[in-house]
C-alpha cells in the first residue's frame, strides 16, 4: 500500500516536472496567481516592459485543435493557426512590441481543464512562438474575463513601470461579432475580443486581417446594446414626457420589466419620495400574498407600486381586477429596457457589489418568451414608459458602466 502511494506521489511530481510530452520541463518563465486563482499570469524570463503592446487571444487566434474538433480533447490538442505566426511575432518583437496573450479559460474554474496541464500548454505555445511572451489567463467570470479590462489593468502593473501607449498598441482576436455570410458559414460566438479592444482603447483586428493579411472588411454587429447611448441629455425619464410621477389620487402603479431593468430602483424611489407602498413577490412570497398586501395598503388609503416583472396578461390581470373591484385607477409603468440592456445592468451590479446575485440568461429569456406588450384595453388608465437613466456616486463605476460588459 505504502509503495503504491509513494509511486502515485512520484507520478504526480513527475507530471509537474515534465512537459505535455513527458520530457523534462525547461523553466522558461514564472507563474503567479491572483484572487484565489481567478487569474493566472505567465511571464517569460526574458520578457521586458514596452510602450507598444501586441496582444492576442489564444483559441481560434493563435492556435486551433489538431483533432479538428471545436473544443480541444486535451491540453496537447493544439497547433498554430498560421505557419507564419512565429516569424510574424519575431518581427513584432524586433519592432519594439511586447507580445501578450489574453485568454478566457472558464473551463479551468469548472473543473473541465486541469490547471497544471493548462500551464504546460501555455509554456509549450510560448516555446513554439520562439520569443518572450507574457500570458494572462482568466479562469473565472469576474472582472478579469474579457471584455472586462481586468487583465489589461494587471498588464499595466507588470510592464516594468513602462507606460503603455494604447494608440500604438493592438489586440487581435476571433470573437469579433461577425455575422453569417456566404464566405463565413457561422457567425462568431461572441463580441468579447472586439469589445475588449474597444474598452481598453486599442486598435482591433481579426486573425484573418492580422496574420492572413485579408483586406476583406467582414460585416459585424452592430452590438445589441451600447451603454454610451444612455447618456444623451435628450432622454427624458418618462414617456410621454408630461406623464405625472405621482397621482393626485390613490392608485396602483404596476411595473413591467426584465429582472435587472431598474424597476426595483424606480419602485424604491416612488416609496421614498412619494410614499407609495411597495409590493414585491421576492420579499412577500406568493402572488396571492402580494394581492392581499395590495388590498390591505389600499384599504389604509395608501397608493401601491407592484414591483414584479409582470410580463404577461395573467400576471397583470390579478391587480387590474383588484383596481376595478375597489374603484382605484391603475397605471402601467414599463421599463424601456431590452434584454441585452438588462444583462448589462446585471453584470455591472455583480462587478460592483459583492452581495449582488447573478441572474442567468435563461431567466431573462423566460421573461422575453412570456412577454405581451401592455395595452389600455387590459384596464390601465395610462401606460408610461420609464427610460433607464443611470446615476453614479463613484466615478470609476460610471467609467465601468460605459464599457461593453456582455460578450
Curated annotation (Swiss-Prot):
Q: Which domain of life is it from?
A: Eukaryota
Which segments carry the region annotation Disordered?
1-20
Question: Which Gene3D superfamilies does this UniProt record tie to the protein?
Answer: HAD superfamily/HAD-like, P-loop containing nucleotide triphosphate hydrolases
A Gene Ontology MF term for this entry?
double-stranded DNA binding
Among SUPFAM superfamilies, the record links this protein to: HAD-like (SSF56784), P-loop containing nucleoside triphosphate hydrolases (SSF52540)
InterPro entries, A to Z: HAD-like_sf, HAD-SF_hydro_IIIA, HAD_sf, P-loop_NTPase, PNK3P, Polynucleotide_phosphatase
- Fetch the NCBIfam families from UniProt: DNA-3'-Pase, HAD-SF-IIIA
Q: What is this protein called?
A: Uncharacterized protein F21D5.5
Amino acid at each position: 500500500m505504502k509503495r503504491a502511494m509513494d509511486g502515485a506521489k512520484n507520478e504526480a511530481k513527475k507530471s509537474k516536472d515534465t512537459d505535455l510530452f513527458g520530457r523534462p520541463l525547461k523553466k522558461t518563465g514564472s507563474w503567479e496567481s491572483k484572487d484565489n486563482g481567478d487569474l493566472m499570469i505567465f511571464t517569460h524570463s526574458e520578457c521586458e516592459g514596452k510602450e507598444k503592446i501586441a496582444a492576442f487571444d489564444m483559441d481560434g487566434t493563435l492556435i486551433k485543435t489538431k483533432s479538428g474538433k471545436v473544443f480541444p480533447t486535451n491540453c496537447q490538442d493544439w497547433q498554430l493557426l498560421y505557419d507564419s505566426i512565429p516569424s510574424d511575432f519575431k518581427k513584432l518583437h524586433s519592432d519594439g512590441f511586447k507580445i501578450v496573450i489574453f485568454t478566457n479559460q472558464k473551463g479551468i474554474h469548472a473543473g473541465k481543464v486541469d490547471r497544471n496541464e493548462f500551464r504546460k500548454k501555455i509554456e509549450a505555445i510560448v516555446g513554439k512562438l520562439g520569443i518572450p511572451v507574457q500570458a494572462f489567463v482568466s479562469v473565472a467570470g469576474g472582472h478579469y474575463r474579457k471584455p472586462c479590462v481586468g487583465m489589461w489593468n494587471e498588464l499595466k502593473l507588470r510592464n516594468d513601470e513602462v507606460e503603455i501607449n494604447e494608440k500604438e498598441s493592438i489586440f487581435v482576436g476571433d470573437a469579433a461579432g461577425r455575422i453569417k455570410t456566404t464566405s463565413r458559414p457561422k457567425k462568431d460566438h461572441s463580441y468579447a475580443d472586439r469589445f475588449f479592444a474597444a474598452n481598453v482603447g486599442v486598435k482591433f483586428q481579426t486573425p484573418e486581417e492580422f496574420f492572413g493579411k485579408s483586406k476583406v472588411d467582414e460585416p459585424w454587429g452592430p452590438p445589441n446594446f451600447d451603454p454610451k447611448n444612455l447618456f444623451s441629455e435628450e432622454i427624458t425619464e418618462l414617456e410621454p414626457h408630461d406623464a405625472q410621477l405621482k397621482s393626485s389620487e390613490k392608485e396602483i402603479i404596476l411595473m413591467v420589466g426584465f429582472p435587472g431593468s431598474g424597476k426595483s430602483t424606480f419602485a424604491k424611489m416612488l416609496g421614498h419620495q412619494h410614499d407609495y407602498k411597495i409590493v414585491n413577490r421576492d420579499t412577500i412570497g406568493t402572488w396571492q400574498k402580494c394581492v392581499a398586501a395590495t388590498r390591505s395598503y389600499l384599504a389604509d388609503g395608501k397608493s401601491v407600486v407592484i414591483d414584479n416583472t409582470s410580463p404577461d396578461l395573467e400576471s397583470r390581470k390579478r391587480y387590474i381586477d383588484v383596481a376595478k373591484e375597489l374603484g382605484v385607477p391603475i397605471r402601467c409603468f414599463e421599463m424601456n429596457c431590452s434584454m441585452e440592456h438588462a444583462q448589462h445592468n446585471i453584470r455591472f451590479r455583480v462587478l460592483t457589489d459583492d452581495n449582488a446575485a447573478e441572474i442567468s440568461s435563461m431567466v431573462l429569456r423566460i421573461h422575453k418568451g412570456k412577454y405581451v406588450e401592455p395595452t389600455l384595453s387590459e384596464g390601465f388608465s395610462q401606460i408610461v414608459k420609464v427610460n433607464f437613466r443611470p446615476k453614479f456616486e463613484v466615478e470609476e463605476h460610471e467609467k465601468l458602466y460605459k464599457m461593453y460588459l456582455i460578450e
